[in-house]
A protein has these predicted regions:
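Extended, charged/polar low-complexity intrinsically disordered regions
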Residues: 2-203
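Dynamic helix-loop-helix/coil hinge segments at AAA+ ATPase domain boundaries and subdomain interfaces
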Residues: 183-217, 544-551, 630-633
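Short, basic, glycine/proline-bearing loop/turn elements
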Residues: 201-210, 258-259, 618-627
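Conserved ASCE/P-loop NTPase catalytic core
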Residues: 207-347, 361, 475-495
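Short glycine-/polar-rich loops that comprise or flank the Walker A/P-loop
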Residues: 231, 282, 322-325, 359-365, ...
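Phosphate-sensing "switch" segment of ASCE/P-loop ATPases
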Residues: 319-326, 331-436, 440
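C-terminal helical "lid" subdomain and adjoining coupling/linker elements of P-loop NTPases
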Residues: 375-379, 405-481, 486-504, 590
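Peripheral, non-AAA+ core regions of ATP-driven protein-machinery
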Residues: 497-689
Length: 689
């Protein structure tokens, strides 16, 4: 019964929204199921289709809608120009003397003749004279062009061969020729926040009633690059979650670059032709399948970094400005837990991007794509929403407005946010205000909700930078302070509470975790697992492949044990037992060469049948003579220990002097256990006094 009441109340709420929409935004809305119905059979942009549907089907009377749909289909069939039929249509125009077409028209001013000329995209004709009334009335004709219904006439004059025989008799835009932003702001006042979110999501084709609040906000975040200039967004997640849909289908102002090779000339500036690339022509450039991004030019990523940071880039002798936002979407092939344990959430990027902290630091927002459900038919709406073109154009108009400083009235940002973090958070706050409250009217609580969301999206970037870049990005405890109460509130990311590489509780005897520098130069976690069998003193190592230095370090430990085993314990035998140790590089950074001390502890642990202390990370190394070696990059090593779940850290006394390089709150996270010799390290690791 309760389910029935809930369904009825949802239907009632939707009926209220539909009624308000028809009253406030008449002619600007369309029923989205009609779009789906016709789109399946017509290769015409969604925004053109929805404009026609808005003209003919803006009613709740099924008969009117049916007639309207038939009209739209007829208009598309008779008048839409397919590029492969352009010559046929020109021939029909010549025979009949007049013909009506649907095409994308761009108008240019010819300065030499002081006249306006039209260019037809699909029909492939240029320099067609057009009355100056049209570009004056419909300014979007001059800014990239719009789709129109055009009545053409054909009149060939023998005496005047220089004049075009094709004339424009009448032109009617079938995209919004002009968007009144004040009308939108006034219309927004008629709706609550929840109603407005539902309208926005239905306008991009989604059904909000099938999504929870968190999923709704994440889908709205995909619109941020369309509403903010120079906004850099990243979304990685499972397949079939619609990551690229909005940039390809919804906005005529964004372009989707499918993964693969691209060039600086195509993306930024063509030196030969002296023309600006995609970033100067579009509001948003989205890269699909980030794993495949590959610049033919060596300086491609450097120019991209420049553009992402400042909205400008230098090519040749001049600097070019570009307001385009950049979006990077791609697939994650493993579970988030596995990625968090073994690498970073930027793992799907190509190596030259995914490990470049300077590039990744320019990301303003990381949407957790794994939290968005895989889309099924019920996730797509059949209800009313804005005509896609109207949505895209008012979003474009809102790019001109700024709300980044709105949070200063009620809040200030915590100390852990540096300049880049602050810019990212302010951009997100401004963008979300434009989407949710275009009229600029919101409460302190509503602003706080946006601020928390923005801090989380940026912190996700910073957490991964900390993994890749160490102490340079240590400040990740993002917070905001209430100006009235002076209370500080901290914002975390949900996935950080996931499983750890170094587990809680006791390990099996012979199992040791060590943290040190791998082959790649990065610091990571390595696991040793041991076996002891009856035998004659053989020592076998697996997982080291043919790496001579790693094998040498392991042999150093076994030789040390043979020489000093009795000093550690009389029960350890290196003549009647065989030992096997498997070495694992848990984070894929290349095996460490500092294996002598961890190997010695693992051998003693399995030989004595005694596990190491719970949640222990072993740091440091010994030489063949048993001399202790200091820990390199101690602060970064301790940070990796913390991220990996270690609660106790075994350290050489020689590294005590370096603790001053690590922040006090980081050191406070551990029980530090110092050792003074190799034997002392074994005793303390096994918890023997």
């Amino acid at each position: 019964m309760s389910e029935y009441i809930e369904t009825v109340s949802t239907e009632d709420a939707n009926a209220v929204i539909d009624s308000k929409l028809r009253k406030v935004f008449d002619g600007r809305i369309v029923r989205k199921d009609l779009t789906k119905k016709i789109k399946e059979g017509a290769n015409v942009p969604v925004y053109v289709l929805e404009f026609l549907l808005g003209q003919y089907c803006s009613s709740d009377d099924e008969d009117v809608i049916e007639t309207g749909v038939a009209n739209v289909k007829r208009i598309l069939a008779e008048n839409y120009v397919r590029p492969d039929e352009a010559q046929k249509i020109l021939s029909v125009l010549r025979q009949r003397g007049s013909y009506t077409v649907i095409d994308k028209i761009t108008v240019n001013l010819n300065i030499k003749t002081d006249s306006y000329e039209a260019e037809f995209s699909n029909l492939g004709i240029k320099a067609i004279p057009i009355s100056e009334d049209y570009p004056t009335k419909y300014d979007r004709l001059l800014c990239g062009g719009i789709w129109c219904i055009v009545q053409l006439e054909y009149e060939y004059v023998e005496e005047d061969k220089r004049r075009s025989p094709i004339l424009i008799h009448k032109l009617t835009p079938i995209q919004m020729p002009h968007v009144d932003i004040e009308e939108l702001k006034q219309g927004r006042k008629a709706f609550t926040q929840e109603e407005w979110i539902k309208i926005l999501l239905r306008s991009i084709g989604m059904e909000p009633d099938k999504l929870n609040d968190r999923e709704r906000w994440l889908l709205l975040a995909r619109m941020l690059p369309l509403v903010e200039n120079n906004f850099n967004l990243c979304e990685l997640g499972p397949r079939s979650t619609g990551k690229s849909h909005i940039y390809k289908e919804i906005s005529p102002n964004s372009i989707l670059v499918s993964g693969g090779q691209t060039t600086v000339a195509n993306l930024f500036y063509n030196m030969g032709r002296k023309t600006v690339g995609l970033v100067g022509l579009w509001d948003c450039v989205a890269f699909d399948e980030v794993a495949g991004i590959n610049f033919k030019d060596k300086d491609g990523i450097q120019i991209m970094k420049d553009c992402m940071a400042s909205g400008s880039f230098a090519r040749g002798k001049e600097e070019k400005a570009a307001t385009a936002s950049m979006v990077f979407v791609g697939n994650i092939n493993q579970s988030v837990d596995v990625l968090l344990k073994t690498s970073s959430l930027f793992d799907p990027f190509p190596p030259e991007m995914g490990t470049d902290t300077a590039f990744l630091d320019r990301m303003h927002c990381y949407i957790p794509g794994w939290e968005i459900p895989k889309f099924r038919p019920e996730h797509f709406t059949n209800d009313y929403g804005f005509i896609t073109d109207y949505l895209a154009e008012f979003i474009r108009e809102l790019r001109k407005e700024q709300y980044g400083d709105a949070l200063d009235k009620y809040f200030r940002l915590g100390k852990n946010l540096n300049q880049r973090d602050t810019i990212a958070v302010r951009k997100m706050v401004g963008g979300m205000i434009k989407l949710l409250y275009p009229d600029g009217e919101f409460t302190k609580e509503q602003l706080e909700e946006i601020l928390k969301f923005a801090l989380e999206m940026r912190r996700r970037v910073k957490e991964q930078l900390k993994k890749l870049g160490g102490m340079e990005f240590y400040d990740v405890n993002f917070s905001y302070i209430d100006n009235d109460t002076f209370e500080e509130h901290f914002v975390s990311v949900p996935e950080q509470g996931g499983g750890k590489l170094i587990p809680e509780g006791m390990c099996n005897p012979g199992q040791v975790y060590t943290v040190s520098q791998g082959k790649s130069g990065m610091i990571g976690v390595f696991r040793l697992e041991s076996q002891m069998l009856p035998g004659n003193g053989k020592f076998e190592r697996t997982g080291l492949n043919s790496d001579g230095k790693c094998k040498e370090a392991a042999n150093t430990a076994f030789n040390y044990l043979k020489a000093n085993g009795n000093r550690i314990s009389g029960t350890i035998s290196t003549t009647t037992k065989d030992y096997i140790i498997n070495y694992q590089d848990l984070q894929g950074i290349g095996m460490t060469e500092k294996l002598a001390l961890p190997t010695l502890i693992a051998l003693c642990s399995i030989a004595l049948g005694k596990p190491t202390l719970s949640s222990l990370a072993v740091l440091g190394e010994i030489s063949i003579a048993g001399t202790m070696l200091k820990v390199d990059e101690l602060a970064n090593a301790l940070q990796v220990c913390l991220d990996s779940g270690a609660k106790k850290v075994l350290l050489p006394i020689t590294s005590a002097a370096d603790l001053g390089t690590a922040p006090a709150d980081l050191i406070g996270c551990f029980n530090l256990i110092f050792y003074q010799s190799a034997e002392d390290a074994v005793y303390k690791a096994l918890g023997v006094e």
